[in-house]
Amino acid sequence: MSEPKTILVVEDEPDEVAYLSTLFADNGYHVISASNGQEGFEKAKAQRPDLITLDISMPEESGVRLFRDLQADPAMAGIPVVMITGVTHEFKRFIETRRQVHPPAAYFDKPPDRDQLLAKINELLKPVAAR
């Protein structure tokens, strides 16, 4: 049996971290978390998750900055990023104006719809041949 896929949850709100961590763990994923962008980058670099969920508004280093840093690092640029944030519309508009930045794999408003979020996570983490 293969190892469970790892999801890194980068979120500064403890309740949201608990919700997402429980949701993903209950569905067979290994979950690690970080409370800000700087910690998220360090954990992504050290643990190479299969997918990252990311909030935009966080202390110390914003999700936007972390997203750009991940895209700029060749070792991490291929990790799918799912934005889960309260400012989805503004972020989408920001990314659409930046041609040098690829958009994230998906966007979800807070609180995300559980079934839609899981469907997208499952789709993104399917083996490439199964997609």
Label each PLM-derived region with a short phrase.
Residues 18, 65, 88-109, 115-119:
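Alpha4 helix (beta4-alpha4-beta5 surface) of REC/receiver domains from two-component response regulators
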Residues 84-86:
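Hydrophobic/aromatic residues positioned on beta-strands within the core alpha/beta folds
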Residues 11:
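Conserved acidic carboxylate
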Residues 1-8, 113-131:
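Non-catalytic signal-transmission and effector/linker regions of two-component phosphorelay proteins
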Residues 47-53, 58:
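Active-site beta3 strand of CheY-like receiver
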Residues 36-39, 62-68:
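Acidic catalytic/metal-coordinating carboxylates
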Residues 59, 68, 77, 89:
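The feature encodes the CheY-like receiver
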Residues 14-32:
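Two-component/phosphorelay signaling modules centered on CheY-like receiver
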